[in-house]
Amino acid sequence: MKVGLVDYSMGNMHSVSRAIQQANQQVCVVRSESELAQVHILVVPGVGHFDLAMKKLEQKGLRTGIAKWIAKGNPYIGICLGMHILFETSEEGKEEGLGVYKEQVKRLPVKVIPHMGWNRLECQNSECQNSEWVNWKAWPNAWAYFVHSYGVMASSQACATTTYEKIQMVAAIEKDNCFAMQFHPEKSGEFGLWLWREVMKKAASL
C-alpha cells in the first residue's frame, strides 16, 4: 500500500519519509493533484507559516485536490502545519484552511515561544480512550517532541492533549478519516515509531 507524502516545500521530507518506511510502508512523493491517484494514504507534514502553506498548496493544485481527497473518505495524516491547515482559519494569516475542524489556530498564549522539546501527552479523558485511530492505553506515559508557536487550545475532537506553561492544547486530533498531530512523531523516538504503525494500520483499513 503506497503512502503519499505531500511535498509543498514546507516540511522535513527526509525524516518523515524515513519514519514511514520504518513503519513498513512504501513512500511515494506527491507534488500535484494528479499524483494523488497513485496513493492510498496521504501524509502532509509541514513547518512554517499558515498562509504560505495554503498558497503553496494552491500553486500545485493540491489545495483543492486534498479537500476532495478528504471529502471522499480517504485517509489523511497531518503533522504540525499539516494539522493546522485542517482548521478553518489561523491567527497567523488571512488564508482559509481546509475546514475539517471548526476551531481557529491561535498563537500560543505563553511567555516562551516556540514550545520546543519533549512534552508529555495527556490521554486520559473519554475522547482519548475512545479513539478510533490510536490505542493510547498501550502507551500510557507517552512523551513526544514539539516545535511550534501556534496551536489549538481546545477541541471536542482532540484525542490527546499536552500542557505547556500551564496552558493545555491539542496534541492530536481525529475525525473520521483524518488524524493529525501537533508534535513530530518522526522525532519522537520509539513512541513515534509505534504511533506511526498504529495510524498506518488504521489508515489502511479505511
From Swiss-Prot:
UniProt GO cellular component terms: chloroplast
Domain Glutamine amidotransferase type-1 positions: 2-206
GO molecular function, one term: glutaminase activity
Domain of life: Eukaryota
Biological process annotations from GO: L-histidine biosynthetic process
Catalytic reactions on record: 5-[(5-phospho-1-deoxy-D-ribulos-1-ylimino)methylamino]-1-(5-phospho-beta-D-ribosyl)imidazole-4-carboxamide + L-glutamine = D-erythro-1-(imidazol-4-yl)glycerol 3-phosphate + 5-amino-1-(5-phospho-beta-D-ribosyl)imidazole-4-carboxamide + L-glutamate + H(+); L-glutamine + H2O = L-glutamate + NH4(+)
E.C. number(s) listed in UniProt: 4.3.2.10, 3.5.1.2
Residues forming the catalytic site: C80 (nucleophile), H184, E186
Pathway(s) where this gene product acts: Amino-acid biosynthesis; L-histidine biosynthesis; L-histidine from 5-phospho-alpha-D-ribose 1-diphosphate: step 5/9
SUPFAM superfamilies reported in the protein's UniProt record: Class I glutamine amidotransferase-like (SSF52317)
Subcellular location: Plastid, Chloroplast
PROSITE patterns: GATASE_TYPE_1
Keywords: Amino-acid biosynthesis, Chloroplast, Glutamine amidotransferase, Histidine biosynthesis, Hydrolase, Lyase, Plastid
Claim: Signal is one of the keywords in the record: no
InterPro entries tied to this protein: Class_I_gatase-like (IPR029062), GATASE (IPR017926), Imidazole-glycPsynth_HisH (IPR010139)
Pfam families, alphabetized: GATase
Major localisation: plastid
Annotated PANTHER family: IMIDAZOLE GLYCEROL PHOSPHATE SYNTHASE SUBUNIT HISH
Task of the protein: IGPS catalyzes the conversion of PRFAR and glutamine to IGP, AICAR and glutamate. The HisH subunit catalyzes the hydrolysis of glutamine to glutamate and ammonia as part of the synthesis of IGP and AICAR. The resulting ammonia molecule is channeled to the active site of HisF.
Record note on quaternary structure: Heterodimer of hisH and hisF.
Protein name: Imidazole glycerol phosphate synthase subunit hisH
Species, as recorded: Cyanidioschyzon merolae (strain NIES-3377 / 10D)
